[in-house]
From Swiss-Prot:
Residues 1-36 are annotated as: Disordered. Pfam families: Ribosomal_S25. Residues 22-31 have a biased composition (Basic residues). It comes from Solanum lycopersicum (Tomato). PANTHER family: 40S RIBOSOMAL PROTEIN S25. Belongs to the eukaryotic ribosomal protein eS25 family. Keywords: Ribonucleoprotein, Ribosomal protein. The gene is RPS25. This is Small ribosomal subunit protein eS25. One of its GO terms (molecular function) is structural constituent of ribosome. InterPro entries: Ribosomal_eS25.
Amino acid sequence: MAPKKAQAPPPSSKPAKSGGGKQKKKKWSKGKQKEKVNNMVLFDKSTYDKLLSEAPKYKLITPSVLSDRLRISGSLARKAIRDLMARGSIRMVSAHASQQIYTRATNT
């Protein structure tokens, strides 16, 4: 029996690595933490007065706008909008399942 010859590996489709050296392993980022907003869940006198005086003058009125400007929760902003609608201070522009858009009431 003849001794076996060492066979060369078949040529692969990938090119051979050119000795690049060791690369540093990428670290995971810590991720950004969103700042907690401490919005009110009930109206106090000053905020309610501000709502009645300033909100009807806004060109665009949505629950998110009121929540951001008056520092109130989203559910309280929706209730405030219903109150302003009942008073006739604002009028509806568009209503959708997830977003309601209002504007100031004009004398038309």
